[in-house]
């Protein structure tokens, strides 16, 4: 039986970002005690492919002399500060779209940079640019793998990091040296998280909106039909609350064919369970990551099929858009590539990738007027006017980040 209300719900989502193999998943394990790369292909290849999630409490503890230290383990003379959710984003260049969709959930970020490699590596640069584009300002730089380098190299690495972030959103971010593998200096990192990444304030009286980042079928093969559980959606509420028994609507829903036409039907279902981490709740609020058990056929939700959708109360969800008008803002240079490439202007009829909250879709530029572009989408999205959208372009067989847009209108 899952215990109720043993721990408060997480109050903040913190992204774990950086270049592949710089130790993000190991650092997540050191912070939370949880491995996030449990997908079979991830274990085989040793990299994160999907977004990983883990929650951890942070305790403020006092020793007999009154000195303070921070930890996830509750001991004597310890006060619970809060619970945080870690979003472990893949660092591999082919998985940039997954990292971008995860950034929609982040209230702050840990940018992991390995001391034993020159800084910046391609995805270090790309992920920092993504944080800038998505407006994530609360950043801590984690200088990892200090156990693998000399003192001189650690200092040289620190200087490389300072030069790299100069003039960026992370120019004044603290740099915390750690060894994630040996859990060295993790207490200092917890202290920095408490100081530099505050829990955002949300309006819990608004209609609930949840960005869906994962969806699952939790039934084991061979489960009797009478014991099957409904599909599960996972993500983060950005406003409002969900309670047990709520009727919810999921948009864009399910794609069906009517004659020669493709039709998208919104899905409605009932909330039958609410979980954050390993605890169940009667209601969930914004702040951390949560999983909602529903009465949906689990076949519909298996394998992240509902990723990129939005859930809300019935009739209170955003419209489904098949086209959008954006005010575009392009970077000077393509990021993530080993070569220095300038970003060329967007062209009419060009195909681009758009990350709208947790949804990744492809669209064709139909019309342009100055920096304003009109795009028809291959797959529709649920969105709001004023949302920030990441724009990617195919460069040398990879989707590369080239800028962002602000949604002006949706159709």
From Swiss-Prot:
It catalyses: GTP + H2O = GDP + phosphate + H(+). Its cofactor is Mg(2+). Transmembrane segments: none annotated. Residues 9-201 form the tr-type G domain. GTP binds at residues 21-26, 144-147, 179-181. Residues 46-50 are annotated as: G2. Keywords: GTP-binding, Hydrolase, Initiation factor, Magnesium, Metal-binding, Nucleotide-binding, Protein biosynthesis. Mg(2+) 2 binds at residues 21, 46. This is Translation initiation factor 2 subunit gamma. The lineage of its organism: Archaea, Methanobacteriati, Thermoplasmatota, Thermoplasmata, Thermoplasmatales.
